[in-house]
Amino acid sequence: FGPAQRLHGATYVVDATFRRPELDPDGLVVDIGRAEERLKVALAGLDMRNLDELDEFTGQNTTTEFLARVVFDRLRASIHEGALGEGARGLTGIRVTLHESHVAWASFEGEV
């Protein structure tokens, strides 16, 4: 991976896109307030940390792509736990994008 493999910091802008085939009865894709709250929960513990020191990431190359998948998995779990509300049960997919800069970003997306 070259010089990026050495210890370095990154500040990301994180976007989460929620997908469903039809709007819910309230005209929503997802309750944005709950989605924002759950995104904060998904990111908790990652800020200002050496990610290679976290037990859950032992042996992993903590790339931007890997982190996008971690956030995706956490948001998907929130949907299945009901933390995004009953309306979120109609969601069919999520895309998580981590922007390192205006020219470098990575996304992970999948079905829920």
Give the predicted meaning of each segment.
Residues 1-112:
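Charge-rich, low-complexity N-terminal segments
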